Amino acid sequence: MKNGNISAENKHALEFLFPINGDVVNERDGVSSENGIILTVKLIGKPDGEVYVNNIKAANKNGRFTANVPVSFYRSVLVANDIKNGETTEITVFYFSGAVKKFRLSSDDNILFLKDITVNKDKYSSIFDNPYLAVYKKAHDLYGAKVHLNLFYEVDKEAASKFNPSPEGFNLSMTTDKFRNEFIKNSDWLKLAFHSKSEFPDKPYLHGTAKEITADYIAVNREIMRFAGKECISDSTTTHWGAANRECVRALRSLGYRSLTGYFEKYGDEFIVSYYMSDKMCEHIGERDFYYDLSEDMIFGRIDLVLNERSYGEMFEKLKKIVSHPHRGGFVSIMIHEQYFYPSYVNHLPDFEKRVLTACEYLYKNGYSGAHITEVSEEKHLKDNPLFKKKHTGLKTT
């Protein structure tokens, strides 16, 4: 038996073209039904084949097969059987029923706002007296944004050199715990997570070890627990540069992370912020909201737009295209980097706040509501289909 993963077209092997093994689907991928969605499943096989998918006969156009198959459960197995040629293949797909018309705002490379809160702990009466966090509070209060901040453990020398004055010397262990209760109070919409030890070196986990990433995670997570409470900790993150080999991803999964986000987008000659994924898989994930890598039990989410990468006008035009995209516009993930907020940073963006608020406003006015990845990827009321706890033959029954 063969699993339905992306491969070169083979007219003599029964293979799923859409969805593929590990695909996450939602209402944008099919037609809504009373109990879920109807997917138009596409396969390739022998031209003379007679194929059934979960007991539903597929139409055959010279070896290209389509079948309208209901998907109603969080996890479903699709079994295709060519009863004429004796070929069978199956895939597992996931249905995130609450992942349409949702958006997420995240930020990477965070640490400096915590230094400011610590330095001003006797002056500030709230964490939102910090100007940087105040931007996200506005995004939440005005547009319902749910915000996710990925943290460095320390400000390294090279990163500090890009600021004037330099913020070198600060690490999370210095963060005040005075505002712990306020972090907890706002933890329904404001989440914190491990990013990496520091900004440099780049891509620390691309060739890293489980021991290294675990040590860095422990250092960051211990301090988040201390100054913000376990309620603020997210089970999703983006590792620094979205680069991590399988060993490091396995370590993160064992530590409790359920999802990782990245670009899965080509810059020049290579895909970046794409973890260990092959170019072929990056091409696929880059056109989806989510993908579930069953081999590592890890969900991968597509970051749709990095707010600090383009001019304001280009950013806004790209956001419009994403919203209208048939397979990326269900759950829209927007992201920015903390350092661009500060006038002391060499690449400061004076319109940082405008970019964040305008993007959130546009999504809100187009019917989107804020959500954390955990909220849309949890099984909740959707249970594994009991029909698939036993081997499904894929044969039509009478």
In which residue ranges do the predicted regions lie?
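Short proline/glycine-enriched turn/loop motifs at strand-loop junctions of beta-rich domains
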Residues: 43-49
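Short, compositionally biased P/S/T/A/G/V-rich stretches that sit at domain boundaries
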Residues: 1-33
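Metal-dependent polysaccharide deacetylase catalytic core of the NodB/CE4 family, i.e.
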Residues: 146-245, 267-271, 334-341
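Surface-exposed, short loops/turns at beta-strand junctions within beta-sandwich domains
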Residues: 68-75
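Active-site-adjacent pocket scaffolds in enzyme catalytic domains
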Residues: 116, 159-174, 178, 231-232, ...
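Active-site beta->alpha N-cap acidic-glycine motif
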Residues: 90-181, 233, 334
